Amino acid sequence: MIAHRVGEPFGSLVLAVAVTVIEVGLIVMLMVSGGDKAASYARDTVFAAVMITCNGIVGLSLLVATLRGRVAVFNAEGSGGALATVTTLATTTLVLPAFTTGTPGPEFTGAQLAFAAVASLSLYGLFVTVQTVRHREYFLPVTAEGRPVGPSVHAPPTRTAARWSLGLLAAALVAVVGLAKLVSPAIESGVRTAGLPTAVVGVAIALMVLLPETLAAVRAARGGRVQTSLNLAYGSAIASIGLTVPTIALLSVWLSGPLVLGLGPVHLVLLALTALVSALTVVPGRATLLQSGVHLLLFAAFVFLSISP
């Protein structure tokens, strides 16, 4: 209801921030519980969010759109800028720590972590400004002829209804973050009992919190608003990195233990391939069933290699 009231691209932004709040709450609760495995939970969850959004949600949205209309059409300027932001944030926070030499292992020094946090937050703020103010038209759905899609036939909710929805959303977020204290250990225990790698904890968290985004993106794609689907996907990835990393960096001052952010070789390859394939997908402003299959294959490879590294 809030998203319908404020319209695009503000609606996608509201949902992305709400999802990120839940994600941060789950990560923090897991890290507070401590243990040797807690050091990599933030990295695993953020990377999983990037792979789920850029491959899973994008691939599924393109699949639905191309099955419905053969060719999915979107705004290359807005999608390209969003993808560039995702790639830059992911490289700064997840790739560079694997190659820096200030500390042993895939970790930032204190100064490097502070720089990465400030840079991530600044770039996120710049992206939001461009998306909602400077070049809002680049993030609006378009028709096959490149013209903006008309407004929804459904009347937007009243201002009073939107305010009630906003209040309920805030209350729900507080409740969900509070429940994270109970849910996080259960996820960790379930993964350990199943004998799965620790990285699966991050995948499980990301899959759970991104489910609303996935449903909203598929619904938009079914309605011919592929740009809205891409706004949701890339916006969630940007929020996941741009808000989660600064928050975890700040909390690391009080949390004991290291903070591992650098990716391993397999995940570096998957991230590089995702960036390359995504660029080839968004630059033309049109996509077919083939592009959706490529993204879904990359997502399947990520899930499989997380379970069986």
Descriptions of predicted regions:
Residues 1-309:
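Hydrophobic alpha-helical segments, chiefly the membrane-spanning helices
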